[in-house]
Regions:
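Short, functionally important secondary-structure microenvironments
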Residues: 1-192
Length: 192
């Protein structure tokens, strides 16, 4: 890697870190690491961004905005014992909510999310090329609906459409937990 490329990547990382802090309106710790995807730790307030070679600035902007959505809207509470829902189910519903809220807060972000998810879909980031999406479990289809549903057709039965709508209508974390419990219960039945 030449000096220009290394310097450009460093500046880009600094810019994305500053963007995260500005959007979150707090002095988050922003780390750039060799990880599979971005994440945000609500307890330590650490936002981790992956070092991807093939992703555009638009994808990084979306990753930053998504994780800032968690920083702004996902509370740091211990809900696992009380609700007894696997975190992966809550994350699917919470992702839909925080993306809706961050796009509502920053009017320029809907286009960023649209373009970034289009790019990720084009790169087969979700590894769907050899799969029939309709054969996937409901939680996976729900997740895909809210991420790349603009670019693929996903079939849902009547009850699943109700759960999709409930997910899209969540405004509070308490509502996320209620809907997540319904999604989890349905998925358990789906496996029987």
């Amino acid at each position: 890697m030449d000096t220009y490329t290394r310097k450009h990547m460093t500046v880009n990382q600094e810019v994305k870190g500053t963007l995260a802090k500005l959007l979150a309106t707090e002095d988050l710790i922003v780390e750039h690491k060799q990880v599979e995807t971005a994440s945000f730790n609500v307890e330590t307030r650490v936002l981790t961004l992956p070092l991807w070679e093939r992703a555009s600035g638009t994808v990084y902007d979306m990753l930053v905005a998504h994780e800032v959505g968690h920083a702004l809207y996902t509370p740091c509470i211990d809900w696992i014992e009380e609700y007894k829902i696997p975190p992966s189910f809550v994350n699917v519903v919470e992702d839909a909510r925080i993306e809706k809220l961050i796009k509502r807060r920053y009017a320029g972000l809907p286009k960023t999310f649209f373009n970034a998810y289009n790019e990720l879909h084009g790169m087969d980031f979700f590894q769907l090329a050899d799969l029939d999406v309709d054969d996937m479990g409901f939680a996976d289809r729900l997740n895909l609906h809210y991420k790349i549903g603009n670019f693929i057709d996903i079939d849902f039965n009547d009850y699943e459409r109700e759960l999709v709508a409930l997910t899209g209508n969540t405004e509070t974390f308490e509502e996320v937990l209620e809907v997540s419990k319904k999604v989890y219960e349905y998925c358990k039945q789906e496996l029987q």
